[in-house]
Each structure stands twice: as structure tokens, then as C-alpha cells.
């Protein structure tokens, strides 16, 4: 009965989508694959998870209850920055990291534009039709959202989420995280070359398709 009460067990229950692999779930929640394999095996033996052409949660009400528990826990221990990056995986809606977070994801964490831990925005693209639902989701964790970055002085906490609504989302996955396509990410970095020159050099070494020889337009932009 208590198999789902551990931290990693709860994260697996919340992040699992029908058809997921063990590796896919591990990447989603930024955990070691072997650790998650043992967790999934335990959940499968207890009857919470089944494998049929991918992993499946037996009873979706368990996921709903887990999210309620996580919400209550956040009242006592608010999400850290690293935990905030995992939270969108639990929303059950399509999204993709965009802007400076797309650069961060495509460089596999190798390039992080200066962001103060006390004033830390996350940037995600969402469906226009899901905008209100995303706002409600982050409200459960008392994380403010807006379509443009809010001044730190207007916030009670350090984390905010900047939602970028789109009619459609084209997403790729890098290390389990959904992110806008590489071509779009490079175009964004080119547009803000003054901030992302080093990132473009890094992307050029990581991916053969990246062209870093364009005529860049330097801008002074507050993200």
C-alpha cells in the first residue's frame, strides 16, 4: 500500500504518460535510469503500473491524488529552481521550453545566461487554448505566471514562469525535456547575439546543422 509514497515513486506516477519507456520517464524527471527502473519494477509488482507496449498507469485517480499531495507539500516547502523545471511534466499538457531556456536545453545545460537565483524566470511555449489552465496549474504551487517577465519587486518568491502562447507547438526532446526546434533556438540566439555568442559557438560544435556565420544583429534586451 505504501509503495507510491516515496519521492521518486510519486514523481514517476505524476510524470508517466501512456507508452513511456523507463529511460523516457527517468529523463523527464531528471533521475538516474537504473534508479527509476527499480522504482518502476516495484510499482509494477504492487499493481500500480503495467507494461503493454510501453508503461501505463493502472488508475489515473492515483495521479490526481499525487498531484494534490504535491500541491499541499508546496505550501510548506516551495519548489526549488531544479524542481520547477520538472513541474511542467506533471501538468498533463503539451509545452516546450523556449527563449533562453531553449538555449539552456539545447546546450544540455552547458550555457546558462545570467539569471539571479533570487529572480529566476522560466520560459515555456504553450498552446493558446491552454493558457488559463497553465496559469491555474502554477497557481497551485504559488508560482506567478505572465506573458512577459514580471519585475522582481512585484513578486513574493524568486521563481516565475513566462508563458508564451502559440496556436501550435512544434517540440523536440533533449534529455527528456520538450523544447522548441534547434533552428528556432539558433534564430533566437542570433537575434540576441550579444547575450548568446558563446552559446552559438557551443551549439555550432554540438550540432552540424547550426550555422553561426550569419551577420548578427546585437541587441540589448532584458529577458
Predicted regions span which residues?
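Short, cationic-aromatic polyanion-contact patches
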Residues: 1-9, 54-75
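Short alpha-helical "packing" element that flanks the helix-turn-helix/winged-helix DNA-binding module
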Residues: 8-12, 16
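A short, conserved structural fragment
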Residues: 44-54
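Active-site nucleotide-donor binding segment shared across nucleotidyl transfer reactions
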Residues: 73-138
Amino acid at each position: 500500500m505504501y509503495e507510491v509514497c516515496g519521492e521518486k515513486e510519486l514523481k514517476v506516477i505524476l510524470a508517466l504518460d501512456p507508452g513511456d519507456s523507463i529511460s523516457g520517464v527517468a529523463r523527464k524527471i531528471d533521475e538516474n535510469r537504473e534508479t527509476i527502473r527499480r522504482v518502476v519494477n516495484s510499482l509494477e509488482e504492487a499493481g500500480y503500473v503495467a507494461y503493454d507496449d510501453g508503461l501505463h498507469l493502472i488508475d489515473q485517480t492515483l495521479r490526481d491524488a499525487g498531484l494534490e499531495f504535491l500541491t499541499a507539500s508546496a505550501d510548506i516547502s516551495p519548489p526549488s529552481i531544479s524542481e520547477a523545471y520538472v513541474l511542467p511534466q506533471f501538468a498533463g499538457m503539451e509545452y516546450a521550453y523556449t527563449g533562453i531556456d531553449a538555449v539552456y536545453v539545447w546546450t544540455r545545460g552547458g550555457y546558462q545566461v545570467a539569471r539571479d537565483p533570487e529572480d529566476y524566470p522560466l520560459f515555456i511555449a504553450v498552446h493558446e487554448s491552454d493558457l488559463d489552465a497553465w496559469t491555474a496549474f502554477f497557481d497551485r504551487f504559488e508560482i506567478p505566471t505572465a506573458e512577459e517577465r514580471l519585475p522582481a519587486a512585484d513578486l513574493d518568491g524568486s521563481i516565475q514562469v513566462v508563458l508564451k502562447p502559440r496556436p501550435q507547438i512544434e517540440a523536440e526532446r533533449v534529455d527528456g525535456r520538450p523544447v522548441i526546434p534547434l533552428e528556432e533556438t539558433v534564430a533566437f540566439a542570433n537575434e540576441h547575439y550579444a547575450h548568446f555568442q558563446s552559446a552559438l559557438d557551443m551549439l555550432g560544435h554540438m550540432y552540424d546543422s547550426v550555422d553561426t556565420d550569419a551577420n548578427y544583429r546585437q541587441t540589448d534586451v532584458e529577458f
